[in-house]
Amino acid sequence: MKVYKDIFTNDEVCSDSYAQEDPFGNPEFREIAFEVKSNKRIKGNDDYGIADNSEDAVEGMGADVEHVIDIVDSFQLTSTSLSKKEYSAYVKNFMQRILKHLEEKKPDRVEIFKTKAQPLIKHILTNFDDFEFYMGESLDMEAGLIYSYYKGEEITPRFVYISDGLFEEKY
């Protein structure tokens, strides 16, 4: 299994157990980012009702049961709120830091990043109110933000990650 970690904080933020798709359904963004679909799951109930009828099992769930988004729960992501102005300042700094990282570690990615990052960020800024932002476990604002949005009538959000802000670790 591959786990994706933030290049600046080593926060685990995703894994290859989630199918990667084109961000926002746009294949042009695929060279710089990927999108994964989340699911809801039930957390906290020790009695799974294995021997019971499944309808009875749901009725019998205790007060300690909660519905969670799998990605948020598995990787201890925390929602954060930013104004559009704060986000613009953050993303400018973050993109410069990624560019510097690429120049040092992956010079072959520099031109692709320069070409593809701007349209992606423009899309996010244009649709700013549709997004919720998440941070990794360290809650470090130097790390990459994870972008969450709802596609169409889906009941769980999709999460978008900037690929050059991550590295893979195999387990």
Swiss-Prot record:
PROSITE patterns: TCTP_2 (PS01003), TCTP_3 (PS51797). It comes from the Eukaryota. The keyword Ion transport does not apply. It is found in: Cytoplasm. Transmembrane segments: none annotated. The keyword Manganese does not apply. Residues 1-171 form the TCTP domain. GO terms for cellular component: cytoplasm. This is Translationally-controlled tumor protein homolog. It comes from Plasmodium chabaudi chabaudi. The lineage of its organism: Eukaryota, Sar, Alveolata, Apicomplexa, Aconoidasida.
